[in-house]
Amino acid sequence: MLQNKSYVRKTRAGKIEKVVKEHYLRDDIYCGAPACTVCDTSAARLSPNASTILVLDTNVVLNQIDLIENPAIDNVVVLSVVLDELRNKNLSVYNRLRALCSSPVRKFFVFSNEHHRDTYVKAMVGESPNDRNDRAIRVATQWYQRHLGSAVRILLITNDRENKRKAVEEGIFAETVESYVKSLGQPQLLDLVVQPASEDVVMDDVEDLRPSKKKIIYSEHKPMSEITAGLHRGIYHQGKLRVNRYNSFEAYVGSESIGDEIIIYGRTNMNRAFDGDIVAVELLPQDQWHVEKALSIAAEVGNYLRAEDEDEDVHLVPNSSDDAPRNASVQGPNADASLNSARPSGRVVGIIKRNWHSYCGSLEPMPLPAGIGGIAHALFVSKDRRIPKIRIQTRQLGNLLDKRIIVAVDSWDRLSRYPSGHYVRTIGEIGDRNTESEVVLIENDINCRLFSAQVLACLPPLPWSVSSEHLSDPNREDLRHVRVFSVDPPDIADVTNFVHPGTPLDDEASQRGTSVYLVERRIDMLPKPLTEDICSLRSDVERLAFSVIWEMTPEADIISTRFTKSVIKSCAALSYVEAQARMDDSRLVDPLTTDLRNMNALAKKMRQRRIDRGALTLASAEVKFQIDTETHDPLDIGMYQIREANQMVEEFMLAANVSVAEKILKHFPFCSLLRRHPTPTREMLEPLLRTAAAVGLDLDISSSKALADSLDRAVAVYFCSGDLSPPEYLHYGLAAPLYTHFTSPIRRYADVIVHRLLAASLEISKLPTVFQDRPQLTSIADSKDVLHNDLLHVTKFWDIMPVYLNYRHRNAQMASRASVELHTIIYFRKHPTDTEARIVKIRSNGFIVFVPKYGIEGPVYLTAKGDNGGGEWVVDEQHQQVKKADGSVSYNVLQMVRIHLEVVEPQPNRPKLQLTLI
C-alpha cells in the first residue's frame, strides 16, 4: 500500500518548496511476541512468558534512559516513531536505546509502526507534530492490545498528563514511570527515576524535602529568541564554557565575536552553566573587568568560597597561567601597566546547548531528616572538581557512602544552590585500584567493552598467512627480498586490507577512534587477533604492508618518493633498547647494525633540518611505572628514557606522514584529512618570555625548544583540507606546511582514513563515498560538531558512525594522564619521600616545581590555604621572583629546592599528592 507524504521546506537560497515522498505501508510486519498466533515468531525478541509488554513514549526514553538500561526494565516494544523522534532530539540517547534493541540479552523489540498499514496515522489539520506522534504511539499500543488479546497486558508508560488522559479514555492501560517502578517491588530502582519538573507532567504525591527557604539565587535564563537576537546585535557573545580545573569558581568562554576569552568569576555569574556548555555571555561594565595581576590562589577565590561553598577545595594551578586567579602585590617597572591590564569579564545569561552527562564521585550526607518512605537526601561530590555538587535522593544511602557511584544531572532550578540529579549505578569501593581505574575510563568516555561477535566475525580465521592471491595482486609489490626490520613501534602494516568500510569492525574502530594507553593496561581500537597475530611485524614472518619508499642522498635529501602496498618479511623485530644497544656496540658490523647506523645518521640530519626550520621539541616528561605482576600496584616510578633509537624512528615516521599528506592533498584537495598545529598567540607565550628574561635569556620564540611549557593551549587538531586555506594547514610544532597521520593505523582511526585516501590516490581502490562529502568529513574530524550538536543535518550521516577524531584523541590523552595520576597517588601513599625539584613558575603564594626524578609537576605553597599572605610575600615580575616583604627570603624561577612528597586527603575521598617545601 502506497501513501504520499508531503511537507514544505526552505532551500539555502531562501525559497519555499514542496516535497512529496512516497510512503509504503505493509501488513506483514511482525509484532515480536513469541506467544502471537498470527505473526511469524522465528525472529521474536520478547520473552515467551511475559505477562506485561511495555510501550514507552518518547519523553520517557529521553528522560529515563538510565532507568530503562536497568535489567529490571524488559519486554519493551520500541516504536519506530519514538526512534525517529529520539534521533532528532538526542543522538546520545538514541544510540543507547539502539544498543538495547540490538543486545542479545535484553528483550527489546523495534516495531515499525510508521510502515504498518494498521498503525500508521496521518497528521490531522491543525495537529502539531508532537500531538500527532503521541497519537501514533496510542494507536500502536491499541493495535498490540487487539493483536495479542487478553493473554498479555500492553502497558503504555508516559509522564505526559494529556497523553495519559487520552490513553485512559481510549481504553489503553497507562501508567507513569514512577507508579510502574513502584509496582515492581524493588525500592532501589526508584533512585533511578528522574523527577519531572514540568506542569504538563504527571507526578506522584512526593513531599518536597528541599529547604523551605526559597531564595532566588540565580538569574533567569534568557529565552532562545532573545539570545539569538542579542547575538545578532552583538549584545551577547556565544562560546563554550571552560571551568578552571583547579578553581571551580573561575571559568572562561572563548568568544570569536570579541576575539578574546571572557572570564566568568563565581557561581553566580556562571548562572548554572556546566563545564562544556555552549552559553550566551553578557559583558560586565568595564570597571568590573578582571585586572591582570600576579597569580595567586587567595583573596578573590576566598571570597567566593566564603560566599558560596566554604568547603570547596581550591588549588594552586600547575598548568597554564590563564588557569589561576590573580590577586597579589606586584613589584618591578611593569607593575603599573599590569594593574591597568584588564581582561573582559562577563556573566552567563543563557544556555544554548547543555553538556550534561553522567559523573563519577561519592556521596556527602546532608544534615536533613530522612523524609518519607526511607528517602534520604545527599550531596554528590564529583571527582571532577569542575562539577558542582549535585543534590540527589536515595533509598540506599547506607550502602552508598563508601562507594564510587555514577550520578546524572536532571535539572537546576534558579532557587537551588545545587543542581538536582539521580543515582545511576555503583562502580565499587572508594580507593580500590580497579574501581578508581574504571572511574578514569568513565570520566573520559573510554569504551572498554569486549569486542562483539559481529566485530570478531569480520576478522580472517587464524592462523593467517600471506596467500598466493596477495602475491599475485598487481597493486601489491613483493618486497620480501629487501632487508626489512622493525624497531618498536612497528612499521606501517596494511590494516585497511582487513578493515573494510561499512563493516561492524570498521564501525567499532570509528567509534573508539584510538587505542588508549593506561599505566597497567592498553585498550585497543582493533581486536587483538588483528593487531597481534595478523598485522604486527614479527621476525621472519611475511606480512602485508603499506610502504612509503624514498630514494635519499647521504645528506638526507629526498630524490624521489613512491607509495605501494607490499608484502614484506622482517629480518628482525627490535625494541628501542635492542636497537640502541646494537648501534652502540662497536664490535657489531653486520648488515642489520650497519643499516641501523646509516638510518640513524640520516635521521640526525633530518632532525637538524627540521630544527633549523623552526621545529620544536614539544614532548613533555613521560612517567614510567614498574608494576607488580600480581597485585598490579606500582613498585617504582621514574622518567621514561628517550634514546637515539626513539628519535630515529620518530624522524622517519614524521617524514612518512609529511609525504603522505602531500600525496593525498594533491589528489583530493577538498577532502583530505590532515593535522595542523596553529601558531600560538603572543599571549600564550608571554609567561615563557617573562621567565626567559628573568634569567637573562634573549629568547627567539619562533624556534626555542623551551616553548613546550607555554603551548598548553595550542593544540594540534585534525581538519578537512576543504575547510581552510593552505597557509592554515601549518603544523607549527613540526615547522611543516603539511602533515597528517598515516603510520599507526593499528591504534588510530585517523590513519585508517588516510590509508584509504592514499589507496584511492594510487588508484588501488575507490574513494569511499563518505570522503566525497566534505561537510560529512568535517563532522567526523571536528568533535564540537558531533558532541555539541545532536541535530546534525549532514548528507548520509546515518550511513556511518561518527568518529569524533579530535574528541577521542583528547580523551585518550586525558585518560592516560589520569591513570598516571592515580598510580602516582597509589605509589606515594606507601612511599612518602624527600627529593629535589626545580621551580618553573612563580605564584604570589608559592610556586610550581618540576621533580626531575619522577617527572612530576605540582604546586608548593608558601602561605596557608585561605591566607592571602597579607603582603608577607610579594612577586617581582621582572626577575620572576617571589620574596618576603622584608627581603629576608626569596625564591627564583629555575632555582633548585628540596621538597617532601606525600599523599594527603584534605577532603573526604579526594586524595592528592602534596608537595611541601623543606
Question: What is each PLM-predicted segment?
Answer:
Residues 50-58, 72-74, 152-155, 159, ...:
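Core residues of folded domains in eukaryotic genome-function proteins
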Residues 57-64, 79-81, 157-159, 177, ...:
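Structured beta-strand/turn binding interfaces of compact recognition modules in eukaryotic regulators
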Residues 199-496, 502-541, 873, 879-892, ...:
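Charge-lined substrate channels and their catalytic hotspots, especially those that engage the 3′ end
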